């Protein structure tokens, strides 16, 4: 009897609901994130900014865990979410403007500012657009190309909302000027450039997915998620 080999991919959700206690890769990802989060939570440059920046991250983890049984994603999507949260936690530890990775990029590539925030925005668009698309395609039963396009809009919307929340936080902060400088680093177009980088990352990922799908099925606009 020939056994069927289970296929795992970015665009195909698992056909079998795996209990969390048996999902070793996901357990490992969660353990890595918890350890990294705990380490970066120790002595951040600015503790208030740290908890402000990571409040939403903790909410994402809670919501993702709550919907694990009802709407399980592929482990590749979970890996993308975890990697973004780690990159974000690292930036928040150094208030982004002082992140060593960005300082290295600044010296090596000749940037005029610490561009780690741009890197994280690019990663947000690239990594998080995949699970968003997966939810739209498999849970909401949208056509494949619709799911890809709408996921791009969702990424841009979330990035814009984050920029607005930073403005509100700065308005309520006692050290308003310090917060603005640490986030924008003197760039008056900081929010727009962050959104553009998120858009670029999402477009690259979704564009690649559409290209791969087109090579396999020319009628991509008619493709819906299988029941």
What are these regions (language model features)?
Residues 49-50, 101-102, 116, 159-203:
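Interfacial helix-loop-helix junctions of multi-pass membrane proteins
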Residues 140-156:
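Internal alpha-helical transmembrane segments of multi-pass membrane proteins
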């Amino acid at each position: 009897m020939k056994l069927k080999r289970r296929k795992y991919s970015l665009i195909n959700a698992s056909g079998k609901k795996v209990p969390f206690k048996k999902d070793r890769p996901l357990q490992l990802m969660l353990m890595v994130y918890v350890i990294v989060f705990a380490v970066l939570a120790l002595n951040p440059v600015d503790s208030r900014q740290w908890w402000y920046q990571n409040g939403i991250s903790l909410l994402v983890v809670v919501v993702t865990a709550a919907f694990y049984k009802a709407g399980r994603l592929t482990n590749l999507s979970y890996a993308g979410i975890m990697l973004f949260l780690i990159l974000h936690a690292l930036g928040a530890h150094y208030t982004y403007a002082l992140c060593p990775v960005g300082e290295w990029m600044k010296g090596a590539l000749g940037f005029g500012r610490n561009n780690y925030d741009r890197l994280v925005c690019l990663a947000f668009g690239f990594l998080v657009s995949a699970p968003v698309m997966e939810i739209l395609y498999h849970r909401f039963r949208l056509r494949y190309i619709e799911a890809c396009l709408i996921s791009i809009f969702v990424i841009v919307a979330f990035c814009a909302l984050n920029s607005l929340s930073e403005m509100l936080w700065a308005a309520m902060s006692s050290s308003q000027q310090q917060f603005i400088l640490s986030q924008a680093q003197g760039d008056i177009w900081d929010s727009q450039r962050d959104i553009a980088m998120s858009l670029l990352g999402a477009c690259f990922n979704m564009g690649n997915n559409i290209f791969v799908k087109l090579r396999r099925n020319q009628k991509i606009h008619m493709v819906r998620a299988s029941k």
